[in-house]
Amino acid sequence: MHIVVVGLSHRTAPVEVREKLSIPDQSISESLKTLSINSDILEVSILSTCNRLEIYALVKEINIGISSIKEFLTDYSSVNFEDLNPHLFDFRQEEAVLHLMKVSAGLDSLVLGEGQILSQVKKMMRLGQENQSTGPILNRLLSQSVSAGKKVRSETNLGTGAVSISSAAVELAQLKIGQDHGVDGLVSLKSEKVLVVGAGRMSRLLITHLKSKGCNRLTLLNRNIERAVNLAGDFPDLEINCKSLNELDKNISLSSLVFTSTASEKPFIDLARVEKISLNNKLKFIDIGVPRNISNDVKHHAFIESFDVDDLEEVVSRNQEFRQKIAKEAESLVKDERIIFLEWWASLEAVPVINKLRSDLELIRKEELQKALSRMGPDFSARERKVVEALTKGIINKILHTPVTKLRSPQSRDERQASLKIVEKLFSLVDDE
């Protein structure tokens, strides 16, 4: 059995490729079922975020397993394999384990140390368990990876400060507005006419960061206006005007800064649409949806600047140097967690031998006990029989304790295999060739 991961991320693919492989929450279950049907895949779990799509699997054979996952990704995205494959990466065994733990810790994120990825890994673990696509190996790996993410955030300063896609989007707005006014740095958003489209978790984070950067009023649009009203209610000190998505064009015309973050699978704002809108201000669009909410052709509008998640790199690079120093400390913690998992995984190799040894000794115990009891005659009470039964079980457990502990203890693969062969030979656990 082998652990592999196949996927793509902001490091390997632009947003126009990533959005074709974004698997929404409501489609995860079906995708897990499709992958699980493959006999080469023993366990599988999917991580889908705005910046990455990664499939972790326990497979019978590495190359066949990776090929099967790539075939699934090709079918799902409807992109030719020759066009998709250059954007895909794969890691195997120890590298796959380390990669997931680094992802969980925020060490592989666009915004180094961002906190949202940890909850996304937790969700990946929950969905795998709910759909019964994961088993003891991946469940343990995912649990250990969550522990790694928590440890990095509690024992280092990597997670401090504004580190999320939403916060980077707000900082990008500050930076671009500042540049318009000849300011090299971040400016207040107090005077901006802000429109937020979408009322999900990312929009909640957007509003939180907008508030911290000086915004005291904004318009919130959502297809379900009740959801927008509920979200606005969580910010009583902000003036939030909630509208239906049907009023999008009107509210775009009244805005100077528009953030979009919806679960739409296709862009709903394109150049043809905005050309019909009478703009009262120069306008900035910042789209953090994946798939994108705003078509790329909007960038051709003379009075609109349009940005997507790939443009956040400009903001991220401003504070990466400080975080890179902390990241080295975090990577050391992650590697420690990897060792813990790998030692546990390696110890499973001993389980069949241990079980066979227990089974053989239990058979001997029962046979010898039965012989002894038959010689004791009818005068031997049931209570006395239970005492002798417990005694013989205790002796077997005492005999097994040291060798079983040794076999399960941390050691190299060669050392463990040598120990297993000795035990198998001494106790005749395998047939002689």
Curated annotation (Swiss-Prot):
InterPro entries: 4pyrrol_synth_GluRdtase (IPR000343), 4pyrrol_synth_GluRdtase_dimer (IPR015896), 4pyrrol_synth_GluRdtase_N (IPR015895), GluRdtase_CS (IPR018214), GluRdtase_dimer_dom_sf (IPR036453), GluRdtase_N_sf (IPR036343), NAD(P)-bd_dom_sf (IPR036291), Shikm_DH/Glu-tRNA_Rdtase (IPR006151)
Residue numbers binding substrate: T49, C50, N51, R52, S109, E114, G115, Q116, Q120
EC number annotated for this UniProt entry: 1.2.1.70
Keyword terms, alphabetized: Chlorophyll biosynthesis, NADP, Oxidoreductase, Porphyrin biosynthesis
Catalytic activity: (S)-4-amino-5-oxopentanoate + tRNA(Glu) + NADP(+) = L-glutamyl-tRNA(Glu) + NADPH + H(+)
Binding site for NADP(+): G198, A199, G200, R201, M202, S203
Pathway where this protein functions: Porphyrin-containing compound metabolism; protoporphyrin-IX biosynthesis; 5-aminolevulinate from L-glutamyl-tRNA(Glu): step 1/2; Porphyrin-containing compound metabolism; chlorophyll biosynthesis
Enzyme class label: oxidoreductase
Site location (Important for activity): H99
Top-level taxonomic group: Bacteria
UniProt cross-references to Gene3D superfamilies, sorted A to Z: Glutamyl-tRNA reductase, N-terminal domain (3.30.460.30), NAD(P)-binding Rossmann-like Domain (3.40.50.720)
GO molecular function, one term: NADP binding
Active site: C50 (nucleophile)
A UniProt-annotated Pfam family: GlutR_dimer
A biological-process GO annotation: protoporphyrinogen IX biosynthetic process
Miscellaneous comment text of the record: During catalysis, the active site Cys acts as a nucleophile attacking the alpha-carbonyl group of tRNA-bound glutamate with the formation of a thioester intermediate between enzyme and glutamate, and the concomitant release of tRNA(Glu). The thioester intermediate is finally reduced by direct hydride transfer from NADPH, to form the product GSA.
Subunit structure: Homodimer.
Family: Belongs to the glutamyl-tRNA reductase family.
HAMAP family for this protein: Glu_tRNA_reductase (MF_00087)
Role played: Catalyzes the NADPH-dependent reduction of glutamyl-tRNA(Glu) to glutamate 1-semialdehyde (GSA).
Entries under NCBIfam families matching the protein: hemA, PRK00045.1-3
Free-text comment about domains: Possesses an unusual extended V-shaped dimeric structure with each monomer consisting of three distinct domains arranged along a curved 'spinal' alpha-helix. The N-terminal catalytic domain specifically recognizes the glutamate moiety of the substrate. The second domain is the NADPH-binding domain, and the third C-terminal domain is responsible for dimerization.
Protein name (record): Glutamyl-tRNA reductase
